């Protein structure tokens, strides 16, 4: 029996209803469109309506833009838009983007979506270039950069960041990479963060490869050093081994986050339809030791399978694990 206040379709009068609409027109490689989304509760609507365009003027020069008007609890500071001209070629990329988010845009639009942050005016640009060499020890050099700054609508500087990177691929299968980041971040106080990373690898375009890296700098008032190493090997055509190491040291370390992390993976294919996969991970700071084993038999390939999995240690990402044992069984069949 329907109660007072219930709708004819059986939903409560206070239950939210959602509606979404989208129209788009393609113009060759380009397109223009309009989108509307709304959540309606107790007779009042909250959501957004906007237009967007992706335009290509030449094979390499294009433009992307969007403008959105939100509505709901707030009537002012409810606009958002961005403008982004760009250049793209097989060996290069460049763009400049300006974004605007009103002070109350997120308060309205997050009823039907998710806006990470509003109350900002943001300027972003990037430049990437790859150069190939036909002779000599260097085969390829790749440069990348990104620049970002944003302010609050009142003109207060909130953040800026500069990223630079330079990668070298050598003909003897060695690779070198260097990157540097500097950042200003304003929270309860002003922070100046920086990070420099150096990487060395061998045969990284293939599965069997090794690599190592070191990163150092300062992050939110703590000096840090991060050392990484990895190796991948195929002892036989049917098996593979992988190992990863991370060593993080923070100074000062008020939250005791300095740690050793080890990750081991192994696979063994007995046939194309019968194989075993193993995974092991430790994290010293949270005393985490996880083991996973998965045995798969495709009795009716490709979709008919029997899978048996064992797991020791369960936890959300970054949390100490419960060292309990869990056994899973899964059987699939497509008719």
Enumerate the predicted regions with their spans.
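Conserved hydrophobic/aromatic pocket- or pore-lining residues that grip, position, or stack substrates
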Residues: 23, 53, 200
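Low-complexity, polar/charged sequence tracts that form flexible coils or short amphipathic helices
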Residues: 26, 44-46, 56, 76, ...
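A conserved hydrophobic secondary-structure block that centers on an alpha-helix together
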Residues: 1-44
């Amino acid at each position: 029996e329907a109660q007072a206040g219930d709708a004819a379709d059986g939903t409560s009068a206070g239950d939210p209803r959602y509606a979404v609409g989208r129209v788009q027109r393609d113009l060759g490689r380009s397109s223009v469109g309009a989108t509307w989304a709304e959540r309606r509760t107790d007779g009042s609507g909250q959501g957004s309506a906007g237009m967007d365009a992706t335009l290509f003027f030449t094979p390499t020069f294009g433009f992307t833009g969007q403008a959105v008007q939100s509505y709901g609890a707030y009537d002012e500071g409810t606009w958002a838009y961005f403008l982004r001209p760009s250049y793209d070629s097989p060996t290069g990329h460049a763009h400049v983007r300006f974004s605007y988010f009103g002070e109350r845009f997120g308060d309205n639009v997050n009823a039907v979506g998710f806006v990470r942050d509003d109350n900002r005016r943001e300027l972003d640009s990037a430049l990437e270039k790859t150069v190939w060499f036909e002779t000599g020890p260097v085969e390829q050099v790749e440069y990348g950069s990104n620049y970002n700054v944003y302010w609050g609508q009142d003109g207060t500087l909130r953040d800026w960041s500069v990223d630079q990177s330079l990668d070298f691929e050598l003909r003897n299968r060695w690779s070198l990479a260097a990157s540097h980041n500097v950042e200003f971040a304003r929270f309860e106080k002003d922070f100046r963060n920086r990070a420099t990373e150096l990487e060395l690898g061998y045969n990284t375009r293939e599965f069997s490869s090794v690599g190592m890296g070191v990163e150092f700098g300062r992050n939110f008032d703590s000096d840090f050093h991060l050392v990484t190493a990895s190796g991948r090997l195929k002892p036989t055509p049917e098996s593979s081994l992988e190992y990863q190491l991370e060593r993080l040291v923070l100074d000062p370390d008020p939250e005791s986050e300095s740690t050793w992390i080890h990750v081991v993976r192994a696979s063994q294919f007995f046939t194309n339809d019968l194989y075993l996969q193993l995974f092991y991970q430790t994290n010293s700071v949270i005393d985490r030791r996880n083991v996973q084993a998965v045995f798969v038999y495709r009795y009716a390939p490709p979709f008919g399978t029997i899978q048996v999995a064992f797991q020791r240690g369960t936890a959300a990402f970054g949390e100490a694990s419960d060292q309990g044992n869990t056994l899973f069984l899964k059987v699939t069949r497509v008719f």
